[in-house]
Amino acid sequence: MIYKVFYQETKERSPRRETTRALYLDIDASSELEGRIAARQLVEENRPEYNIEYIELLSDKLLDYEKETGAFKITEF
């Protein structure tokens, strides 16, 4: 399952929509909830400075759209 993680690069400032970033993770999980938990743990372990805002499971259509925009790249820690 591919998850899109929205985050701020620092926990020091208040979150602002304009500075929200995203990364993509390929998580092997049996349910969407398990995948969200695993994605959060993975990011928090490897990038503790990130302020995670939201984690979204990408549907096939959304994944195709993300690939078309050119912003899609799986992050590996």
Curated annotation (Swiss-Prot):
**Top-level taxon of origin:** Bacteria
Q: Name one GO cellular component term.
A: DNA-directed RNA polymerase complex
Q: What is its EC number?
A: 2.7.7.6
Q: Does the keyword Acyltransferase apply?
A: no
> Which BP terms from GO are recorded?
DNA-templated transcription
One protein family per Pfam = RpoY
Write out the entry's keywords from A to Z.
DNA-directed RNA polymerase, Nucleotidyltransferase, Transcription, Transferase
Q: Which reaction does it catalyse?
A: RNA(n) + a ribonucleoside 5'-triphosphate = RNA(n+1) + diphosphate
The family this protein is said to belong to: Belongs to the RNA polymerase subunit epsilon family.
Assembly and interaction partners: RNAP is composed of a core of 2 alpha, a beta and a beta' subunit. The core is associated with a delta subunit, and at least one of epsilon or omega. When a sigma factor is associated with the core the holoenzyme is formed, which can initiate transcription.
Q: What is the protein name stated in its UniProt record?
A: DNA-directed RNA polymerase subunit epsilon
Q: Which organism is it from?
A: Streptococcus pneumoniae (strain P1031)
